[in-house]
């Protein structure tokens, strides 16, 4: 079976590709020219753009399964690039897959595609899409997911996966969440805010994707969650792994909003970590996201949070992203 993977150079992609190779799939990967991660000599590399319909027809031609990971993540309120990549790019992939006879389209959506409220009810696959969000990233992921499920009845069998906050090893870029872990380890975040995320290990995401490929179920959607942990929990686990002391102070959200620009100047990396969008996401993150359906139908069993953090820090050390 040949599998074509967009977003192959991202955090999930660099964990998924080895899993596919180990399971004897032929892999064609959409590669960014500026990627500096593993070479994957067994993989057919394809240079193209999800915004170029013609190149995506060539990319999907001959593939049995397409895994659409490519997306623009943004923690800014407005992001024209997120709208373009996450909506138009997904539309191009769907059209190309239909035209070239792809037999299974696995779409990576996000927890952000779904309405967060009501917070006091379990969040699962029945939660409404966040199509009216005033945040471009959230709305773009909701619209992309809507398009995929709509095509499901039109000749293209689909599966939708909705991971929560993804962390773990093989984070070459590193991701926004990987950078948060690095900065906490190095003591560059002087205070914390209340709130947290549902954290999930990227390796568990890769295994769930493999299970979705092998499953005969189609037209299904799966929440891929892990454990909800506060930022203070995260900082404590990082400290136990040899990182900096846990920041003493927890500041109110209005103060964090006002001081975000100061915090960002203290961080490593070019993109801002603290924005009104990212802080609000921490504040209202859902604490009860059910992965029961994925457990039942895909055999999904997320590993413990503390082990994921330990493995992530160990990987960052081995790759000289933090001092050993």
Model-derived features: where do they sit?
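A conserved pocket-lining segment of Rossmann-fold NAD(P)-dependent short-chain dehydrogenase/reductase
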Residues: 128-132, 180-200, 204, 216
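Conserved Rossmann-fold NAD(P)-dependent oxidoreductase catalytic core, especially the SDR/UDP-sugar
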Residues: 88-136
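NAD(P)H-binding glycine-rich loop region in Rossmannoid oxidoreductase-like domains
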Residues: 35-39, 43-88, 96
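Conserved catalytic-site region of short-chain dehydrogenase/reductase
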Residues: 75, 111-121, 166-175
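Conserved beta-loop-beta element that borders a ligand/cofactor-binding pocket
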Residues: 146-169
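Substrate-positioning beta->alpha
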Residues: 143, 174-176, 193-213, 220
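Mid/C-terminal beta-alpha module of Rossmann-like enzyme folds, strongest
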Residues: 208-273, 291, 296, 304-324
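N-terminal Rossmann NAD(P)H-binding glycine-rich loop of SDR-like oxidoreductase domains
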Residues: 3-23
């Amino acid at each position: 079976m040949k599998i074509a993977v967009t977003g192959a150079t991202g955090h999930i992609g660099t964990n998924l590709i080895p899993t596919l190779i180990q399971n004897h799939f032929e892999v064609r990967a959409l590669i960014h020219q500026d990627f500096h991660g593993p070479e994957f000599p067994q993989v057919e590399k394809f240079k193209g753009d999800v915004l170029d319909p013609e190149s995506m027809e060539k990319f999907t031609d001959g593939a049995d399964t397409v895994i659409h990971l490519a997306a623009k993540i943004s923690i800014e309120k407005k992001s024209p690039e997120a709208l373009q990549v996450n909506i138009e790019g997904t539309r191009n992939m769907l059209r190309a897959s239909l035209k070239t006879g792809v037999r299974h389209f696995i779409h990576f959506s996000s927890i952000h595609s779904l309405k967060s409220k009501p917070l006091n009810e379990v969040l699962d696959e029945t939660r409404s899409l966040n199509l009216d969000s005033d945040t471009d990233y959230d709305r773009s992921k909701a619209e992309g997911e809507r398009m995929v499920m709509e095509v499901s009845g039109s000749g293209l069998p689909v599966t939708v996966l909705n991971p929560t906050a993804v962390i773990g090893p093989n984070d070459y870029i590193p991701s926004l969440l990987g950078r948060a872990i690095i900065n906490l380890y190095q003591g560059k975040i002087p205070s914390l805010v209340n709130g947290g995320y549902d954290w999930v290990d990227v390796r568990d995401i890769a295994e769930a994707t493999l299970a979705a490929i092998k499953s005969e179920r189609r037209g299904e959607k799966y929440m891929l969650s892990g454990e909800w942990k506060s930022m203070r929990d995260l900082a404590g686990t990082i400290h136990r792994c040899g990182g900096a002391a846990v920041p003493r102070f927890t500041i109110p959200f209005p103060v964090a909003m006002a001081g975000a620009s100061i915090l960002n100047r203290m961080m490593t990396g070019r993109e801002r970590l603290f924005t009104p969008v990212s802080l609000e996401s921490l504040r209202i993150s859902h604490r009860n996201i059910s992965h029961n359906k994925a457990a039942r139908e895909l055999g999904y069993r997320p590993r413990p949070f503390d082990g994921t953090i330990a493995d992530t820090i160990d990987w960052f050390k081995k790759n000289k992203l933090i001092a050993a």
